[in-house]
Amino acid sequence: NLSTDLWSTMGEQRQTNYALRAPDKATFVELVTEGQPPAPGYFVYNAILNRQDRDLLDETEMPPAMTYGEVRQVVDSGAILVDGRSPEEFALGHLRGAINIGLEGRYAEFAGSVVMPDVDIVLVTEPGLELEGKNRLARIGFDRVVGYLSEPYQVMFSHRDDVRIASRLT
């Protein structure tokens, strides 16, 4: 139960906050975590990063645009291809090996659950959403976006042998 107050004092919180009346740390933790979903998979990694001195995220810095050949080279070397387009667009056609994590949903949380944090990432997005994809991943500590596929629809049209189609069940 979160208060709408913009500020408070420790004295007031000790009187009114149920969790601060817990007799010990274990009871406090139990009270404040009751009914909460489990922490996302990336949470421990992110907590460790939060304790380190790190450069500030430049939210205006675009990831590098990459050609199809450059993308294939880094993916073949172990990078993950994260396709942030809608599930419908992904199903109609995506590059071999791509993982669909749509930007319109819980993008960072889902990516943090399926992508390892120590792996390079290449993005495929709708044109103009590359920076959003990079920034949302960086906010959970996944700052190894090495670039994005430039002109994804033209690339898929030109390299049909590397395009896969997926069925969607509803």
Segments from the language model and where they lie:
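Amphipathic alpha-helical protein-interaction segments
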Residues: S150-E151
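Accessory terminal helices/loops
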Residues: N1-G147
